[in-house]
Amino acid sequence: MFLADGWKDYRILDCSDGEKLEIWGDKILVRPDPQIVWRSDKSREEWKKADAVYHRSKTGGGSWECFSKLPESWTVNYKDLRFGIKPMGFKHTGLFPEQAVNWDWFSRLIKAETQSGREINVLNLFAYTGGATVAAAKAGARVCHVDAAKGMVAWAKENAALS
């Protein structure tokens, strides 16, 4: 297992019974995760400090129940990369933090090649909000970011500007 240990503003605090307790910056969120099939004691203090919990709807989608006022967006940092976080109506925050190990891997490859004078071009398809795009560009690659959703492309541009 590879760990993305460069997060400055993200951590999984706990997980139990299909839910993940995460801290994104200074906001604690509870989100569903079908991979979490075990049960542990949710009476720990961290669970009581959640700023928001995402509840799935039986008809699809879901909604956030907020216990404190969440900003529309805020930033988190992974190493020297910055990303905007926005809780959306389908549990996502705009970033898959577990992908950071992949960003590290290809960043090492890109840096090694560009240091030897080679130009690296990356085509990032289904690129979402640009986590991989930003990481590849920061490592020295020329990146073509492609996503069918205009809103995601705009968000990726925001993330690129942050980094």
Regions picked out by a protein language model, each given a short descriptive name:
Residues 1-4:
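N-terminal accessory targeting/assembly segments
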